[in-house]
A protein has these predicted regions:
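Beta-propeller domain segments
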Residues: 6-8, 30, 69, 73, ...
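Acidic, Gly/Ser/Thr-rich repeat motifs that build Ca2+-stabilized beta-propeller blades
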Residues: 2-83, 131-134, 139-147
Length: 168
């Protein structure tokens, strides 16, 4: 979950979840935003959805962090399906994506102009990012990632960089 950087003015709350496909046999990370009225979420809409849906709801990542420009980072695990998808720029699994608060892709994302690549991608080659935050001084995104048998990582994801999973 994350609050809009302008929450006091706009009231938007963002929630990540494992969204099933229409058959219910696979899932992918999705982000919904809405406003709380009492104990209900109103004015809600999905602003991000991982396509294609690949997993059975594991290794979905799903951490949300806003940067100081109002972009939303969404972590995506490798979905535990053919981990090589983390290296494929036409798929969103094994990636950190960056979108605008309304779900649009920022024009300065690193793969916006690359044919065959998903414009949402910020960095790739991730196994399963489970923690993410902005550094309080540098304001850079920091992310923690589970290794397959130990070897957990702390990364500072940079635009367009490959973090190696599963080849390194």
């Amino acid at each position: 979950a994350a609050l809009s950087p302008d929450y006091a003015q706009d009231g938007w709350i963002y929630l990540a979840f494992a969204e099933p496909n229409f058959r219910g046999n696979k899932a992918g990370t999705a982000v919904v935003r809405g406003k709380l009225r009492g104990d209900a979420l109103v004015e809600s809409s999905v602003v991000y959805t991982q396509e294609p849906k690949l997993s059975h709801g594991t290794h979905v990542g799903a951490r949300l962090v806003f940067d100081d420009q109002g972009h939303l980072f969404v972590t995506q695990g490798d979905n535990r399906v053919g981990a090589a998808t983390a290296q494929e720029l036409d798929k969103l699994s094994g990636k950190i994506v960056r979108i605008d608060a309304d779900g649009k892709v920022p024009a300065d994302n690193p793969f916006v102009s690359r044919a065959g690549a998903r414009g949402e991608i910020w960095s790739y080659g991730h196994r399963n990012v489970q923690g993410a935050a902005l550094h309080p001084v540098t304001r850079q995104l920091w992310a923690t990632e589970h290794g397959p048998m130990g070897g957990d990582e702390l990364n500072i994801p940079q635009a367009g960089l490959n973090y190696g999973w599963p080849v390194i």
